[in-house]
């Protein structure tokens, strides 16, 4: 194989490929980039860590068609230090790769393309199109509540449901739950013209990488394809794909309480600022001690925030709108901050029942075309 590439263009193009490189594997092939130069004037580059993968297509002058696997880290580092305008990549019959640019020559071992694991089929009949900014904003609201190492596999990801032109995302790690739904234009319908209806669970790591790839530009879209075990995101010139988590997701509607009797409307940014100050105490690392919690006392039209640790204490208060009896309740401070930062509302409404039952955090003003809800379990206070 021998191909010639624009060095700056290829250096920029290969950066997203690194999201699917496995750093801890006994399989050397998935530590590399599969370069396939069997087409005309283009070559494809693929990375796949057996859970998620990325494929890009780049312009190339194909001198000798072929395919090979080159170590991803070494390839990217070599491109970065080369100085010529173009890079020539040659792989001989002994799988020795040679990278030339300007007067510089770098050689490294490669692997035959046949050793690369089978990549899932990247196009299926079931697909739809949605705005990148819409999907990215939804991920912003639910990413903080995803589990990564829960004994229940379905919680180690984000649940999505599409029905009647409405996209819903839900995440839960047993201590907190986040739910977001938007009514948006979803291109593609069923053959009879009806709206699409299906659900799927995307792994936590995949969601994190997808968030980095999506743009805030409202004009940009992402085309999504689904099969029984795989999801594919077509984002511009990139194809990002991942396995799906199999199984029935939790019945989150049953978990979310709607019988609260105590309500408080608070300024979100003001509360976050107060909790950030409390974090100086709750997140102190002291030998032999655990992180402390933050206490919230809803008393009349005041919210009193306090925390005590081995090295100090903090107190703060702010004005709120309060309905119901007074209540003292405690939380993991970081969890509460993450919950509030996931929203972008000026004011949020906190619904409570007791010091031992979960709270709901929602926008103070409801919207017709969107919905968001954050549920958080309190921590038990020492007597």
Q: Where is each model-derived feature located?
A:
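Structural preference for solvent-exposed beta-strand-turn elements
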Residues: 1-383
